[in-house]
Amino acid sequence: MEDWMKTARVDTDRSYLATACWPYDRFPEMSQLMAGSQVVVLDAQGPGVVTNFHSSRMDILDEILFTKSAAEPDAYRRVLIEITYDHHEKPDISMPLSAFLADIDGACDQFRSIYFSKVAYSHNFRLPIPFKKHIKIVLKNPTDTDLISYTDVQWKKLSDLPADMGYLKIAYFDEELQIPEEVGHLCHIQGAGTVRAHWMNLGTDLDLAWNGEYICEGNQQYYIDGEEEPSIEYCGNEDAFSHSWGFGDCCGGDLHAVITRMEHPTPTRTEIAMLRCRTLDSIGFQKSLRLVLDYRYDFYAKDSTNPYHKQGVFASRKRVSYPLRVRNCIYYYSLECDKK
């Protein structure tokens, strides 16, 4: 629960709301997210902090207003978000909008958490995004399809930004690994920072993984400040996201950890996504952070030397090797922005 003194304190910071992409109300001159276009959602001088990013579901404009464009049914999955701090030449964050909102491929079920939520027709992103000098948030539509949507960004103008406030950064990983033999190096962040949220999406055609079995294994190892042995190691992907015994409670969870997706987009494909938000259990580091995904110690690894894997239910289960697409996103705060 939020501290009562923070809740009752009279706020002296000026609040603003920037709206975009919706010319069907008071602002007919507002730009839309048309095919091949981009829309500047926020262009603001600092110091300040974005406190909420809200975006409606992206729909094809043809189907709503009967305009003409070569519609791509999944165009909304390809919309990009770019966030640039302090007039940097290149964006500090650049990725698919749906991934930024923790709605991987736009295919997650409805969910809610303290930092992210997906409701019937919109998304909300509540990780604070502080900036010292300037911030620019842009949406890009690289497709041939006109899209209709509504977006708003709430932010505060601050008198000062404390020196220990970090910039929101993202470490994004997307590779296909041969499991269990191949190890995934999901991130290697340099400098000081704090992890506040992360999600993972696992996709495979392995029939044994239809309900999340096999892929729920895998050790997540956090190596902090160059150490040789990880300070934090979860013995199971589901446990790294505060669940246990696989993904039986699909698309359930609490406000800090949620299984957001268990989908079979084809007769053989399984896609599972998990989200975790960190408050008191944030992960801080002073020099570096490295995250490794390792399945080599699991019961179905052919080279396992664990004697328990030769007994009981473990001995009866099939040893396999299979391709696994791993997508992982870490949201962290960094003091290194000025060095870019």
Which residue stretches match the model-derived regions?
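Beta-strand-centric surfaces of beta-sandwich/beta-rich domains
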Residues: M1-K340
